[in-house]
Each structure stands twice: as C-alpha cells, then as structure tokens.
Amino acid sequence: MLLVVLLAASADLITPYDPVWQIDERLTPPNWDYLLGLDEFGRDVYSRIIYGARVSLYAGIVSVILIALPFGSVMGVLAGYFRGWVDTLLSRLVDIMFAFPTLLLAITIVGVLGPSLTNTMVAIGIVYAPTFARIARGSTLGVSNLDYIVASRTVGAGSARIIVRHVLPNIAAPLIIQTTLALSTAILIEATLSFLGLGTQPPMPSWGTMLGTGRRYMELAPWVAVYPGIAIMIAVLGFNLAGDGLRDALDPRLREA
C-alpha cells in the first residue's frame, strides 16, 4: 500500500514522459528507453501506470473516505443510537441496497449519471455507504448502553454531545479497518468501470482503461495490458494486507488471542 502511495505522490519526479504524450513509435516492446514499452498510440506505459496510480487513489479516497464513510457512519450511528422507527427506516434502506450486487448497482448508477470519473466516485460511494452504516449501527448498539453513556443521559447531556464525545471515539476502530479494506475494492471497481468505458475517460491515464484498450493487443503487444493488470493486483493486495494488519492491531479480541 505504501509503495502505491509513494509512486502516486512522486509521479512528476519519477516518470520520464508525459502520460498523454504520443511518440512516433507504436507498440514498442520494453527497452532501456521505454521501461514498460509503448502503447498503441505511442504513449509510455510506465508513465501512464504511475500517473494511473494517482487516479486510482484519488477515486478511492473520494468515494470511500469523503462519501461512503461519513454518510454511512451517520446513518448507522443514528439507527443504533435512537433505535425505534429511525432504526427501522434506515435499516430497511440499507437492506434494500444490500439486495443488489455491488458492481451491478455501481454500473446502473454510472449508466444513469453518465460515464466520468466523478460519477464513478459517486457510484462507489453510494454502494459502499451501507457497509459502513451496518458496521456503525452494530458498534453503536454495543456501546450505547455502557454505564458512562447512561450516566451522561441521566445528567442531561444532549444526544449530539454524547454521540460526538462518547459514541464515535468508541466505534472508530472498526470503521478505520473497513475504510482500508474498502479502498482496495473501490480501486478494483473504478478499474472495472473504466475497463467497461464507464469510468475514467481517455486520454486520462487509468489502469482500467489501459487494461480495456490493451486487451485488443494481447497477442501482438501483451505488455500494454499485462503491466496495468499487475498494478491493479499489487494495489488491491496492498490495501487488503493493510486492512488485515489494522484489524489485528485494533481488534482487542484478536490481540488477546
């Protein structure tokens, strides 16, 4: 995960060519001048993969951290804290969204809004908000009856104060773990939508777009598609391993084991 972040952050320093600059040569195999070869338009594959890391991280951060996490967490905390009709209403909404396959729902949303990176991020954020809502609800139900929270209610503390000062800090750990795991899936969904032509649009470099266009040249120039595929695999694996590590570190039950 750290490797992907560092490559994305230093893309301007470590790429020899502009990712959209077209060289006269086409489908040149990897060599000392072009480390990962050139694509069908004469663009440097290495430079496009490094800049594509920026697109993937940007899509993941916006869709998960800025959309899914806050909206889902608010829904879950409200449902778990107030219960009653609020819990019933929000839980049914979450159940309805869980009834649809994640990728199919994302494709439907982008199909309605139109193909673009922005709409892709909105779609990913919408389909992952229920996951955070369910985790936040379960965690809130577990802490809302603790003695110090009951005591806060008894002395007249408002619901907003209790949620901000007592509930949210106690449910942060599972939400942080889920955020890391969701980032890996968000990168994969963004790549899938771009592969289908619904996500990032040319000439912006995207791993999914590179994989989609490169598949037509698998026999003639396999490097055009293989290297973006490897980049996706490394990024997804890295975030999954980071999520597993955070879970081991933050989950008290696993620490005791």
What kind of feature is each model-predicted range?
Residues V45-L78:
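Transmembrane alpha-helix signature in integral membrane proteins
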Residues R54-I67, F100, A160-T192, F239:
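Transmembrane alpha-helices
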Residues L2-S10, V62, L66, F71, ...:
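Lipid-exposed faces of alpha-helical membrane segments in multi-pass integral membrane proteins
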Residues I109-V112, I124, S139-T140, A182, ...:
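Glycine-rich helix-loop "coupling/hinge" segments at transmembrane-helix boundaries
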Residues V127, A173-L183, P222-A257:
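C-terminal transmembrane helix and the adjacent membrane-cytosol boundary/short C-terminal tail
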Residues M1-P16, V20, L93:
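N-terminal signal-anchor/first transmembrane alpha helix
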Residues R43-Y58, R83-S91, L141-N145, I149-I177:
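Amphipathic cytosolic juxtamembrane alpha-helices at the membrane-cytosol interface
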Residues L35, D39, V45, I67-G72, ...:
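Generic hydrophobic transmembrane alpha-helix motif, especially the helices
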